Amino acid sequence: MPLELDLAGPSFSPASLKAPALAELGRTTLVATAKPEFVQHPLMRHLPRNVALPCVGELHLWRFRCEWLPVPVQEGDAWLSKSERERARLHPNGALRKRFISARVVVRWIVGHLFDCEPRSVDLHDAGHEKIHARHPHDGRGITIDIAHGGIWIVIGIASAALGLSVIVPSPGAVFDIGETSEQSRRHARYRSLCHALRYVPVDIDEDLLSSAKGVCAFDLGEHGCWHVLDLPMGGKIRAAVTLAAPLTLVHLFGWPKGSIFA
């Protein structure tokens, strides 16, 4: 059975969407959506000049290993807030502690560049389940940040609209049909990213819609709005997806191999 690392929210599955209690919410429909522009960047220790605070429809995605940091370890540690240090201290083992610190250091480094301020001065507001909000100190523009983990990877998404990330890793030792497992994991990643973006609002999603062959698709959830889902190539058996509450027009990608196929 596939699992998502570090998922602290309620447990949902596509099968649960057929429950009678959700019938009154109406059916979800798949709507047409255009393929966004993708701009790939190598993982680097400075941001390109053409990368700015994301506007509506723009998305920044970072993928890196826990060992990668844009600055020396000691410098990055000095950026962490008191509450972040306490959270790191309370992690149950060294590996999870290191992963948490790496993700927070990189988030502060990225947002510091986007806001043109010192990383230690970035005011991050935790919204739970690895979701963070930050507001520009001068013009008040806000961004949403989501962090997901899977295998050796840390994935960070940044947008001006609500978003949700999901990374699905098959359970160690599980034996399944390869094709079926891949498709199930992809549906699971899409569904979990929707759940994360919606903050676990229960919605009626047909499992067949989650099996769309397109790597970018949009779901009309009625009163909950239209949400745009993008598959992320991760390699191996890992599957990932990101959901955004706005049509995707431009996606900046950091850390994916050159030539990676999106959508």
Residue spans for each PLM region:
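Core catalytic alpha/beta fold that binds nucleotide/phospho-ligands
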Residues: 2-263
